[in-house]
């Protein structure tokens, strides 16, 4: 009988990550180091452990708005080419060390121009850092493919410019577009021009929707904006009636989301921190998985949530009793939903993900 997944063995499993914010995944030591180099004096702590603890504690706020406040510090130390390159390089290293074989990492270029960099400078530097990180990881025997999503802040008015940026860099490592930030009062339909531009150029995009706000945000993202994926989308559970015996009935919105196989970029630990759910055990991930939605496992912000893909998977295993076949399905779901070309997705699934999961399950295909 195949042994149940443990944290130690999960660390060996290949992973595909679709929802990870570059400015939410810095190493605490890097934040301190760059802050010293650039003269940023507003950090809440000057010790690595104390700073890591502050980010973690501050992010357990119970609201999305308060959860986003610590980003002012990470963004402040990501304003120079040297800092952006380093953060991107280390991001690739950290993900590869956790056996992530494919990642789409997102960031908002508009947050990194306060020291005079242009949008193109920012994106080019980050992509260069990712490429160098990929090369270093391959040399260390931990190959990873890292691609980029450029994000527009939903409370600002730069989404069309950022969409154009995505198209300019589409053959250089940017595979899609996103909008992020506080949902309440900032519906995705305010950015229709950007989404139409992406569709006009046959490009892919995801939308943060259904995280802190409810079904209207999801409906707009799908029906009016045409999102290829949903960032979080956890509130779709509000359109599912669950019986006392565990049976369920999908509402119209939930049904179309499932029927169209629109991927959900679920981030369990982050959802607990922002108050979207009370605990991992109460997270609707398992309900959505049993209902055969295309669920994927993601980190969101590794620094703020003090997490990794392995930890996210292990927490789900502990909460819902998942086995290797479940983790393999969630991983294949993510790889199927990636924004790279079909043949590249298939190659990673068939040549990397399936064989390595088969080995972990004690048999070969």
Curated annotation (Swiss-Prot):
Q: Which UniProt keywords apply?
A: Hydrolase, Metal-binding, Nucleotide metabolism, Zinc
Active-site residue list:
211
An annotated Gene Ontology molecular function = zinc ion binding
Q: Decide whether keyword Metal-binding is in the record.
A: yes
Give, as one word, the top-level EC class.
hydrolase
The record lists the catalysed reaction(s) as: adenosine + H2O + H(+) = inosine + NH4(+); 2'-deoxyadenosine + H2O + H(+) = 2'-deoxyinosine + NH4(+)
Record flagged with keyword Transferase = no
Q: Which GO terms describe its cellular component?
A: cytosol
Q: Which cofactor does it need?
A: Zn(2+)
- Give me the residues that bind substrate, please: 21, 23, 181
Family annotation (Pfam families): A_deaminase
EC numbers for this chain: 3.5.4.4
Residue sites binding Zn(2+) per the record: 19, 21, 208, 300
**Top-rank taxon, per record:** Bacteria
What is the free-text note on the cofactor? Binds 1 zinc ion per subunit.
GO biological process: one example:
hypoxanthine salvage
Q: Where is this site: Important for catalytic activity?
A: 232
The family this protein is said to belong to: Belongs to the metallo-dependent hydrolases superfamily. Adenosine and AMP deaminases family. Adenosine deaminase subfamily.
Q: Which PANTHER family match?
A: ADENOSINE DEAMINASE (PTHR11409:SF43)
Function statement? Catalyzes the hydrolytic deamination of adenosine and 2-deoxyadenosine.
Name under which the protein is recorded: Adenosine deaminase
């Amino acid at each position: 009988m195949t042994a149940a997944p443990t944290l130690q063995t999960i660390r060996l499993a290949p992973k595909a990550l679709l929802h990870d914010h570059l400015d939410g995944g810095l190493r605490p030591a890097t934040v301190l180091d760059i802050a010293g180099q650039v003269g940023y004096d507003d950090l809440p702590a000057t010790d690595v452990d104390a700073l890591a603890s502050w980010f973690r504690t501050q992010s357990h706020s119970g609201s999305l708005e308060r959860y986003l406040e610590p980003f002012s510090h990470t963004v402040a130390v990501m304003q120079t080419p040297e800092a952006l390159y380093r953060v991107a390089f280390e991001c690739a290293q950290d993900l590869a060390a956790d056996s992530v074989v494919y990642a789409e990492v997102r960031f908002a270029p508009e947050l990194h121009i306060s020291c005079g960099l242009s949008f193109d400078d920012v994106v080019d530097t980050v992509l260069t850092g990712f490429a160098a990180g990929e090369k270093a990881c391959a040399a260390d025997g931990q190959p990873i493919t890292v691609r980029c999503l450029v994000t527009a802040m939903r409370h600002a008015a730069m989404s069309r410019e950022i969409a154009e940026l995505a198209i300019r860099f589409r053959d250089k490592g940017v595979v899609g577009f996103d909008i992020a930030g506080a949902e309440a009062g900032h519906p995705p339909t305010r950015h229709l021009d950007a989404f139409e531009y992406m569709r006009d150029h046959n490009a892919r995009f995801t939308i943060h929707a259904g995280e802190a706000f409810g079904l209207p945000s999801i409906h707009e993202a799908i029906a009016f904006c045409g999102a290829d994926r949903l960032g979080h989308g956890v509130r779709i559970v509000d359109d599912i009636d669950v019986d006392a015996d565990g049976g369920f009935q999908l509402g119209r919105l939930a049904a179309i989301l499932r029927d169209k196989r629109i991927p959900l970029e679920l981030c369990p630990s982050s959802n607990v921190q922002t108050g979207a759910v009370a605990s991992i055990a109460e997270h609707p991930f398992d309900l959505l998985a049993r209902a055969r939605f295309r669920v994927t496992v993601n980190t969101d912000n590794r620094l703020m949530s003090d997490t990794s893909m392995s930890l996210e998977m292990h927490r789900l295993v502990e909460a819902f009793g998942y086995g290797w076949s479940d983790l393999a399905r969630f991983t294949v779901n993510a790889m199927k939903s990636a924004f790279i070309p079909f043949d590249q997705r298939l190659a990673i699934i068939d040549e990397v993900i399936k064989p390595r999961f088969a080995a972990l399950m004690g048999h070969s295909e």
